[in-house]
Amino acid sequence: MSLTIAIVGRPNVGKSTLFNRLVGQKLALVDDKPGVTRDRRVHAATLQDLRFDVIDTAGLEETGDHTLEGRMRAHTKAAIDEADLILFVFDAKSGITPSDLNFASLVRKSGKPIVLVANKSESKAAIGGEYEAWSLGLGEPCSISAEHGLGLSDLRDAIMKASGGERIFASKNQEEHIALQSASLDDYIDNLEEKGDVYDKSKPLRIAVAGRPNTGKSTLINRMLGQDRLLTGPEAGLTRDSISVDWEWRGRHIKLFDTAGLRRKSKIQEKLEKLSVADTLRAIRFAEVVVIVFDATTPFEKQDLQIADLVIREGRVPLIAFNKWDLIENSQATLVDLHEKCIRLLPQVRGLRAVPLSGQYGQGIDKLMENVMMMHRVWNRRISTGKLNRWLETIVAHHPPPAVLGRRLKVKYVTQVKTRPPGFVFSCSRPKLMPQSYLRYLSNELRNTFDMPGIPIRISLRASDNPFATRSKKK
């Protein structure tokens, strides 16, 4: 069993910087502004020869339980309960504050082993803060600089001493797991795409939950998980980082990604929000299925349509969730109207799946997941070249390509070159002159004949002959 370590402390002491240093990549958003981290994030980490899971937490603040900061503190307390060991981080440059003293008392009451971490110790001004740290009653401070990577050997030794050294030396399997998690997201995506197209139920299905702010994305995920894992509330823009959580639905392992709400580009001014948006876009690209959460009381706003278009252009499986369905009075008539709008406003993908649900009460979640599983299989579908070319012969005979500059265009051959999403290459004469209307015809006929509704389909053209024609000539 692996060791779990929680990083706690007041805001802006460098917890997320230390988290990023331990996991080997910039997963948590970092900014000079206090209170950047709101949800707790768990990830596999490495420190020299030690292997463990680390939890990044929101900064502890003294405030009422029902405020945003109070709800964040409750999530940090949950992380302390989950952890086997606590890294209590303070800002050695600023010295010990009354908040540090109060929160040190809270951490001591947990009864967990604690390592006191004096961060930002690269400055001479930090010496005074390190002396003051003895007043916390947490033992000798371990001096580090998370930003510059200084003092990590001392931190490794302190963790070993506090934990007793058990459960934190990596086996070969753990090392492979860490190497995979520490790779860049782009490299991981490329690696997945190179491994082939066989549908494998044993691999976790990656689902991102996206949408504009305050549509109920985090509430929906909490209801799926059956626990208040993610911070929720009436405030718009609560989620900042893209947080991944593990879930199981009917025996299938799922990795869910909660994402920050996407606003119109013209409204995004702060650096922190720009970082959140970039994190959300990466989560969408990393996902296989993207559940786009619409507020059923105000659906199909311009931003909703732009997010759906983004998901389609990225080649992910788009699936719309009409959330807050419990607030809709005439549900049957509303659903008919919404489905008609889906067809009219999102023509890029015919047969787009849309499911009404209530994240607050859990209604419609099974229906949503049934559609997710079905569309994910379609997204992975591969069609034999023989079937494709028999289909091509039929549809070209029924509706041949148009004539351009006095000569009829010819489509001679088709093959599927990839899945996830399905991609097809058509061999034809003069591909640059093929009109978009005929490409749409090919795409729609592919959907109808091979039952591929609701997913992006990629079509490309090339000017080359049927490879079988060359063989027949040689004979």
Curated annotation (Swiss-Prot):
CDD domains reported in the protein's UniProt record: EngA1 (cd01894), EngA2 (cd01895)
InterPro entries: G_ENGA (IPR031166), GTP-bd (IPR006073), GTPase_Der (IPR016484), KH_dom-like (IPR032859), KH_dom-like_a/b (IPR015946), P-loop_NTPase (IPR027417), Small_GTP-bd (IPR005225)
UniProt: GTP 1 binding residues: 9-16, 56-60, 119-122
Binding-site residues, GTP 2: 211-218, 258-262, 323-326
Subunit structure of this chain's protein: Associates with the 50S ribosomal subunit.
Function field: GTPase that plays an essential role in the late steps of ribosome biogenesis.
NCBIfam families: GTPase_EngA, small_GTP
Homology family: Belongs to the TRAFAC class TrmE-Era-EngA-EngB-Septin-like GTPase superfamily. EngA (Der) GTPase family.
Descriptive protein name: GTPase Der
Provenance organism: Bartonella henselae (strain ATCC 49882 / DSM 28221 / CCUG 30454 / Houston 1) (Rochalimaea henselae)
